[in-house]
Amino acid sequence: MADYQDKNVVIIGLGLTGLSCVDFFLARGVTPRVMDTRVTPPGLDKLPQEVERHVGGLNDEWLLAADLIVASPGIALAHPSLSAAASAGVEIVGDIELFCREAQEPIVAITGSNGKSTVTTLVGEMAKAAGVNVGVGGNIGLPALMLLDADRELYVLELSSFQLETTSSLQAAAATVLNVTEDHMDRYPFGLQQYRAAKLRVYEKAKVCVVNADDALTMPVRGADERCVSFGVNMGDYHLNRQQGETWLRVKGEKVLNVKEMKLSGQHNYTNALAALALADAVGLPRASSLKALTTFTGLAHRFQLALEHNGVRWINDSKATNVGSTEAALNGLHVDGTLHLLLGGDGKSADFSPLTRYLTGDRIRLYCFGRDGAQLAALRPEIAQQTETMEEAMRLLAPRVQPGDMVLLSPACASLDQFKNFEQRGDVFTRLAKELG
């Protein structure tokens, strides 16, 4: 455990994570200073009186005088103020690094462009099914520091590339990079390989690395080694097996579960289940209780979630698809009896949308594109696309056209912040309108 006594600590970014960092230091007899670029950041009213704060920008004087800066994942390490502090020899970490220095029990660490939250939650459910005292959080749910507890037996953390950039003490019992597709390119000026390098940090010092046999970018830099266990659709130690119209989860040649026993649907969710099972096995959770958890887990909100089924039409809320890879995952292997009405749009974060083109073929698909990058998305296949300003306009446009057997799918391939507070609000609006229009 690290000693922070007499250290000049500055925390950048409030919110729940920033407050968890403040509490962490106060509990150790250190009073940090806090700054946030927002004028009224969330959590400001909960900040103890004795904690100095600076809002509406960064305070370079504080940063240069610090011994330790705890930076929110929301601020780029390339920010001039942080670069100057780093050049002056100031140590810069994130809340995950603080957590890793304290945690005594095994950590399962999960990153990837898509599927992180589902796999993290699933491994947590598998641990609970085995009666293990588990802390689940990180980039989902509770901040990592709020999970620290002497009674814990296991931690399961979802980690973003931003969090991994400031983490060097992670020694995961099992770690995975589920997949690597373009995301956050606005934060990675050197492109996909720079983003991938941040993700791959999760494997450093890991006991077991769970890699995706279908995605070479998830392999450790030096290639697969004896630490690696693989999952994939048709290949890998954990893979899918299709026989006589049935699909099974299979481990090293042995069928372990028929997917019809699972509440989750879709090929991407079956591979998520394989990854979760590989991680659970790697930390010694009993296979029987892990499989039981797979049969009861209903999935997470806004992730290929059935919002409404009415008059033979399914309305699917996949608002969490905030990047191209996530929408590809939703469309890959998707079966629709009638026409697919696909809602795309929002802020594309400088991504290349062209990988979607291969899924937009045939005459049983219609595109409804909205938001900041709607025009770019409509240009993928203009003859079947209609562009509107908002998602609501798009939904009112498509509603009279749907027939029994059709599917209306919100899988926007974009962030939501151009028109919504977050992807959850976008999904909630979709669900409300589906119930009104369907």
UniProtKB/Swiss-Prot annotation:
This is UDP-N-acetylmuramoylalanine--D-glutamate ligase. Pathway: Cell wall biogenesis; peptidoglycan biosynthesis. GO terms for biological process: cell division; cell wall organization; peptidoglycan biosynthetic process; regulation of cell shape. The gene is murD. One of its GO terms (cellular component) is cytoplasm. It catalyses: UDP-N-acetyl-alpha-D-muramoyl-L-alanine + D-glutamate + ATP = UDP-N-acetyl-alpha-D-muramoyl-L-alanyl-D-glutamate + ADP + phosphate + H(+). One of its GO terms (molecular function) is UDP-N-acetylmuramoylalanine-D-glutamate ligase activity. It is found in: Cytoplasm. ATP binds at G112, S113, N114, G115, K116, S117, T118. Keywords: ATP-binding, Cell cycle, Cell division, Cell shape, Cell wall biogenesis/degradation, Cytoplasm, Ligase, Nucleotide-binding, Peptidoglycan synthesis. NCBIfam families: murD. Cell wall formation. Catalyzes the addition of glutamate to the nucleotide precursor UDP-N-acetylmuramoyl-L-alanine (UMA). Its EC number is 6.3.2.9. InterPro entries: Mur-like_cat_sf (IPR036565), Mur_ligase_C (IPR004101), Mur_ligase_C_dom_sf (IPR036615), Mur_ligase_cen (IPR013221), MurD (IPR005762). It comes from Salmonella choleraesuis (strain SC-B67). Belongs to the MurCDEF family. It is an enzyme of class 6 (ligase). PANTHER family: UDP-N-ACETYLMURAMOYLALANINE--D-GLUTAMATE LIGASE. It comes from the Bacteria.
